[in-house]
């Protein structure tokens, strides 16, 4: 269903700020593929999602750079560590409105872990760090919340999810923590909502 939605702008300066923040938290830049194999897509796709995928030369446009990291790991091209990358994210949204889009831009975080427990601990720490970053970007702390989910944590600004964090195994069986470093235009939408209201 498509509603009359106001198209929001992407503020690239927020990515510059987020990059500095996550760099200070130990994350390093990684060049990643924007198209991956179907198993990398399937690995992170929720069971209840019907996925209409964009295909080019037998590869699929990513829904998040998490899949890009999985592809690199599968190919033996991802060293253990803490990585960040920005990709367009293609989604098959059931409802398109002011906060739901078929395409948006997202910085994804990926940190290697030693076990499931370690990966879950790391994802929780990343989610808490994200709340601090969102506050520095201009979202009042009082409207931000950390919500436990079946697979990890979501960060909400009021009733809008602005970050998702969790733990999984790669296709090769290694534990890792993942999360949203920054997503646009949702972060801009949240900032604009409260600008001048503090």
Residues covered by each model-derived region:
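TRNA-recognition modules of translation machinery and tRNA-sensing kinases, especially anticodon-binding
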Residues: 1-198
């Amino acid at each position: 269903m498509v509603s009359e939605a106001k198209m929001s702008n992407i503020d690239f300066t927020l990515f510059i700020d987020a990059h500095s923040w996550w760099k200070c938290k130990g994350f390093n830049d990684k060049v990643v593929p924007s198209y991956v194999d179907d198993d990398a897509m399937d690995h992170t796709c929720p069971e209840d999602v019907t996925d209409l995928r964009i295909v080019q030369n037998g590869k699929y446009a990513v829904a998040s750079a998490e899949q890009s990291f999985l592809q690199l790991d599968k190919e033996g091209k991802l060293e253990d560590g803490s990585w960040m990358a920005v990709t367009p994210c293609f989604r098959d949204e059931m409802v398109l409105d002011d906060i739901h889009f078929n395409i948006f831009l997202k910085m994804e975080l990926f940190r290697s872990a030693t076990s499931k427990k370690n990966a879950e601990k790391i994802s929780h720490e990343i989610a808490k760090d994200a709340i601090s970053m969102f506050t520095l970007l201009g979202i009042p702390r009082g409207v931000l919340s950390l919500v436990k989910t079946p697979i990890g944590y979501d960060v909400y600004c009021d009733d809008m999810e602005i970050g998702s964090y969790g733990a999984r195994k790669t296709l090769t069986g290694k534990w890792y923590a993942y999360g949203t470093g920054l997503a646009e235009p949702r972060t801009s939408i949240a900032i604009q909502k409260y600008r001048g209201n503090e």
